[in-house]
Amino acid sequence: MQSGISYDKLNYISQQLKKIANDLQYIADQTSEIVNGIEKNGFWIGKSADYFQAQFKKFTSCFDETYNQVTSYALAIENTITKYKTIEESVFRKMV
């Protein structure tokens, strides 16, 4: 039975989204390590440090939101694949 849904394409998209999410997480981790190194070495003083930390918090919150959206899209695609396969199998069993 052919529903017209390309599970391979959906699965590929899901895998690509997961890869993007992993890449985003890696960038966030690397950025965080850089910031921690800067703070520990005392390169930032007073208001400059406060400004930098505020800007970094904005960056990381946007980054977290993007990461969460990408991972939720991947999960939604996986759920869609599972549901359609279940429906397709059920219809096929009823036809046989």
Residue locations for each model-derived region?
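N-terminal secretion-targeting helices of virulence/extracellular proteins
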Residues: 1-96
